[in-house]
UniProtKB/Swiss-Prot annotation:
Endoplasmic reticulum in keyword set: no
Source superkingdom: Eukaryota
Family: Belongs to the cystatin family. Phytocystatin subfamily.
Naturally occurring in which organism (per UniProt): Oryza sativa subsp. japonica
InterPro entries per record: Cystatin (IPR027214), Cystatin_dom (IPR000010), Cystatin_sf (IPR046350)
Protein name: Putative cysteine proteinase inhibitor 9
Signal sequence, renumbered to the chain: 1-23
Biological process, per Gene Ontology: defense response
Keyword terms: Plant defense, Protease inhibitor, Secreted, Signal, Thiol protease inhibitor
């Protein structure tokens, strides 16, 4: 009984890992970072983030990379961007994930990267 439980547990773990990998980064598609809509989404994300107020305001400099995922009628954008701060005299790099459904946007994450 104990051996069959371990085999079942291992099978479930492998299946779960396979499902996670299938739904992971492979579903993101690279898109044109210079596309006007991508630029608009990036501008919105920079204005929306708490980092903007914490650093005295952020200004979008460039979108260095852009990926898109379409899931259940919703667009998700994963953007690698560079912004500058009026207070911190240097360029900062961030990864932003934005949810877009119709005209509605939500900032899923906005994290600094190196």
């Amino acid at each position: 009984m104990r051996t069959s439980s371990l085999v079942l547990f291992a099978a479930v773990a492998v299946f779960g890992a396979a499902c996670t990998a299938a739904a992971g980064d492979e579903s993101w598609k690279t898109i044109d970072a210079n596309d006007r809509h991508v630029q608009d989404v990036a501008l919105w994300a920079v204005a929306e983030t708490d980092w903007a107020s914490a650093t005295g305001g952020l200004t979008l400099n460039t979108v260095d990379g852009a990926e898109k995922r379409f899931e259940a009628g919703v667009n998700y954008y994963r953007l690698t961007l560079e912004a500058s701060s009026r207070v911190v005299a240097k360029y900062l790099r961030f990864q932003a994930v934005v949810y877009e459904e119709g005209d509605e946007h939500k900032l899923v994450s906005f994290v600094p990267i190196h």
